[in-house]
């Protein structure tokens, strides 16, 4: 049993090196802090990420994959900056800069390009609802009509991960990524009045056809 767990942890170590977002985080840290300091911070981030992964239990394969490739690297970055010689305000600013400029803007650009596809709204709404309905990343309710679709998320893996890793305050930045990603699109409108990350009892996504 012990050998099995050691091998599993070894595979995680190898997996971390191949996570695409890790390359993005390293590049960001080097640009912001310079080669020497940025590389040192990234090394610390990798160690923290490894610990976060090893301490994550009772998750499905799909949830674990999403945590490793998407959520935990950002939590590890946040915890790395908290341990650096930075003020809380600076830590927030660095994380906000990363989440908005490195993550959200690229997601928005990718979504905007998809709008060029004929019947984009019909396709996107159908896929979005199907994914949310079948995925174990959220606990949600869906409602839809001809020109709109709503998703009320009562639980989401992003918020859960932040709570479980003692950084619930970080979750609001994950929510901000959604606002940038879906804001200002030409064929789909997006509104939301509350989120789990900002202290609400749910995330009330409302999409509508423009």
Whereabouts are the PLM-identified features?
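Short coil/loop linkers at secondary-structure junctions
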Residues: 34-36, 87, 168, 188
